[in-house]
Each structure stands twice: as structure tokens, then as C-alpha cells.
Amino acid sequence: TVLNLTQHSYFNLSGESSGDILDHILELNADYYLPVNKKIIPTGEKRAVAGTPFDFRNRKKIGRDLYNEDDQLLLGNGYDHCWVLNDYSNGVRKISEVISEESMIKMEVFSDLPGVQLYIGNFLDGSLKSKKGMNYIKRSGFCLETQFFPNSPNTENFPSTVLEPGEEFYSKTSFKFSVK
């Protein structure tokens, strides 16, 4: 059985009606990301983040390099890519930190998985409404989806997502919130 479970929770640490998340400050513990094809599926290549808009190893605003003329950003209409997390063999470790300077809320993400997909609501079009009736517009939330690499079954050099009969699967991801 091929198994690659994740979650798709949206966050806006500045609050529901605060607009987009481009001023959120993001840090990712990843030296590589997975480039995608025109269908936004990883090609099998691992590309270094150094010197690219995908370098979040040091904290920076999500929107800082978003409008860079990078082919990968154009394919995903923004960030919709998987990062190859450092220290995968070490189990649960801190993989990310996000801060809203507006609210001073900090979110830390911990996981034992090898990848995290950053999606910044590139295709939210205002048709979804919140419980309070607010329309979710483009980039009004971000997702950090811990997972194995997308397209793993078709990519030999990616970690296997095959679960054999009798095997059990365990994974842990946690989100820690605090006020800075």
C-alpha cells in the first residue's frame, strides 16, 4: 500500500480578517526543495535553496521574494512546493518557525517526516467563506504540510512510501503556539 498522509490546515497568525500572510516571517530547516513540472508535481530533482527565493533557512517574510521571476514560482503561482527537511534521521525535530509581527504570535512546527509542503493560498479565490462569513482571498492563509515527498512512488531517489502487509505506520507532527 502506498501511504503519504498529511494535513492541509490553513494559518493566518495575524487573525482571520487581517488580509494576506505575505508579511509573516518564515524559517524552514531545509537546504533543498523539490522543483515541480507544469502540473505542480515534483520532477525527482532536489535543488539547493541557496541563492533562490526558496531559501528560508534564515528568517524572512514570505512575500519578500514571491514576485521574483523564478520559473518555479511561476509554475506554482507562488510557493506550492515541498522542502527537503534537514536531519530526517533524527526523528522529531523543529522544522519551522513562523511569526506574525502584527499579532506577535509565533508558531513552531515539529515533525519526524522528511518533507514539508509550503502552500500560501495561491488559488484561493474568495469563494470559500469563514464561519463569520468572511471570504478567503488569495494568500490569506498558509499551510505547512508535513509529509513524505509527493510523487515518491514514481521517483526512485525519494524515500519509500510503501507500507508492507503487517507493518504499522506512525508519524508525529506538532504545532506549538506562543506570544513573542
Which stretches of residues belong to each language-model region?
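An exposed, glycine/acidic-rich loop-and-rim segment of catalytic or binding clefts
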Residues: 1-180
